[in-house]
Amino acid sequence: MANGAHHARILDPALIVKTVERLRARISERFPDSGLAAVAADLTETAQATAARVQNLSRPYVGLRLLALLAVIAGIAAQIYVARLIDWADVLRRADPVGITQGLDSIVNLLLLAFAAIWFVLTLEQRLKRRRVQRRLYELRSFAHVIDMHQLTKDPTAVLSGSAPTPSSPERRMSKFELSRYLDYCAEMLALIAKLAALYAGQTRDSEVIASVNEVEELTSNLGRKIWQKIMILSELDEKRARIPAPQPTASET
């Protein structure tokens, strides 16, 4: 029971991929050969790759860990070997206090350098994983901006008002229903991008990775909020137009 509750609190990469694939099918059926359908296809491939990468991210780099262990053992062994070569009794007998102090200072510096090298090797796996995740999160951020560009010229007021376009106006061939579905698809894709980013946060405790994931989630939330504002405007304008009474026939027309 407790194990099931634990899994219920974890995002399932397979379910997210299925949701993205279903959304791609919906967009392709509603808007075939559109730019948004192409973006949805690319997002599907990215979602599938993300699911595989997240699984690999949780696995240890065995070779790198063995190398780190060997480096640590070699560093400790080298320190012990050098220490055993020194006749400390003879050093204390012959050296003056200043010489002893200088010698101890050199030994401390060597130890600090050795520990710094060991720390570098031990954290190498974490830094490699962080670099890879940051690169993938940058890719998701780019997707979010591409989706925002697709909805940028979709103006609900222009669709309902029927105003005459200028020569530089973007093409507006969508009906009210199509525009509503288009904007809704954009909002769904942004939400799924946030979920894909959250998959990386679920596999690491790296503060930098978690901060980058939060940035992606904040970006998609802000862009999605703009889209939902357009959807609300579209709905409100449509309701206002529906409330306008139809013109009554004049006496000459009756």
Label the model's feature ranges.
Residues 192-254:
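Cytosol-/stroma-facing membrane-proximal "stalk/adaptor" domains immediately downstream
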Residues 14, 21, 41-48, 134, ...:
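Generic structural signal for well-ordered, non-transmembrane alpha-helical segments
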Residues 22-26, 95, 115-124, 165-174, ...:
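Short, charged/polar, low-complexity loop and linker segments
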Residues 27-30, 50, 54-57, 147-154, ...:
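Secondary-structure edge/capping motif, primarily at the C-terminal ends of alpha-helices
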Residues 52-128:
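Alpha-helical transmembrane segments and their immediate juxtamembrane boundary regions
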Residues 131-176, 232:
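Solvent-exposed, non-transmembrane helices and loops of integral membrane proteins
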Residues 4-18, 23-50:
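Short, charged cytosolic
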Residues 4-8, 28-39, 55-66, 96-103, ...:
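Non-transmembrane, amphipathic alpha-helical segments
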